[in-house]
Amino acid sequence: MKLTMSAIIMLGLLLGSAHQSAAQDATQTLYKMKCQICHGPDATGSAAGKKLAVKDFTSPEVQKQTDAELLEVAKKGKNKMPAYDGKLTDNQLTELVKYMRDLAKAGPKGK
């Protein structure tokens, strides 16, 4: 009985980990498809994004914004950033904000 319970717990942990990894992979793919062209691979802004005055997502100025403020920009757009309300789900946008925050925590590549 003890072995069976341990096996069930381990299976649950493995399945949960696989689900989380798949969700993270989906968000990373979505970032690459929708965001990276302007925000760059590390959220500091690509060459094209910098020409459009994209803000460095790793900067204190951007990081002090709340998730709700960042979601509002993602939904409605701002300046040259397109609006994604109706194009992406609220969950996708929320996960993208989390992903970009993780990129910001990791810091710019090469620094």
List the model feature ranges, each with a label.
Residues 1-25, 109-111:
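N-terminal export/targeting leaders of redox proteins
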Residues 28-53, 78-82, 102-111:
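Periplasmic/extracellular electron-transfer cofactor-ligation site
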Residues 6-7, 41-43, 69:
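Short hydrophobic/aromatic-rich motifs at helix boundaries and adjacent loops
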Residues 6, 14-16, 28, 50, ...:
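Generic structural signal for beta-strand residues in well-ordered domains
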Residues 14-30, 46, 67-69:
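Electrostatic cytochrome c docking/interface patches
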Residues 52-105:
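Extracytoplasmic electron-transfer domains, predominantly the class I c-type cytochrome c fold
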Residues 11-12, 40, 65:
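Compositionally biased, intrinsically disordered low-complexity segments
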